[in-house]
């Protein structure tokens, strides 16, 4: 038994979609979450800067005595995950491979779409992972740089959000049967995305898929938390305004949480 927390990092609030699923599946595990909303979005930034910011988040989590780090950010996974994983002596998990694997299982026509930040799409990481496992699957990738700012400003239900999502996704409509939400912010726009793509297109939440892998690693390294612990205290940190973060988090997690400000 290991009662240390699991650390989550993201460029902002998007990684809460992963946390929500973890709380549902593994309610006995403690969580420490750091969201770098002050510098979001990461997607348009240079690779060197993204790597630098990611390491700052990693080092912060290490000060919290975490037993595992989850990259709840596709951009950080694409740019820095392999380097961080090789450097640390605790498990480090990314969201890309679980999402790619789920897309392969889901597609019936071999036509998969991937939406993500400019950096995630430019890295071509999803297409590489998908076609490594299933060479016959066709992958169409599309950068959606306007989605993260919508979520970070809590405008997910606005008419502006609906127009931006419709305009952004139009190149994929009618051409795919499975769509990977290749940014953990995007599930917060899921109803609008589903409406635009149509009911026949299966949406893959890469973050939620990653929770299954978290469970596997906890078992493999024998670092599960206390299954009998009912009152688990989580900690949430943001580099931006805690009140805005708290408002979005409370809606998504369906519980009121305390958010602390941190300067990196």
UniProtKB/Swiss-Prot annotation:
Enzyme Commission no: 5.1.1.3
Chain sites annotated for binding substrate: 10-11, 42-43, 74-75, 184-185
UniProt-annotated catalytic positions: 73, 183
Keywords from the UniProt entry: Cell shape, Cell wall biogenesis/degradation, Isomerase, Peptidoglycan synthesis
One example GO MF annotation: glutamate racemase activity
Keyword flag Isomerase: yes
Record-linked Gene3D superfamilies: 3.40.50.1860
GO biological process, one term: peptidoglycan biosynthetic process
Pathway: Cell wall biogenesis; peptidoglycan biosynthesis
Reactions catalysed according to its record: L-glutamate = D-glutamate
Cited SUPFAM superfamilies: Aspartate/glutamate racemase
Biological role stated in the UniProt entry: Provides the (R)-glutamate required for cell wall biosynthesis.
Classification via PANTHER family: GLUTAMATE RACEMASE
UniProt xrefs under HAMAP family: Glu_racemase
Protein name: Glutamate racemase
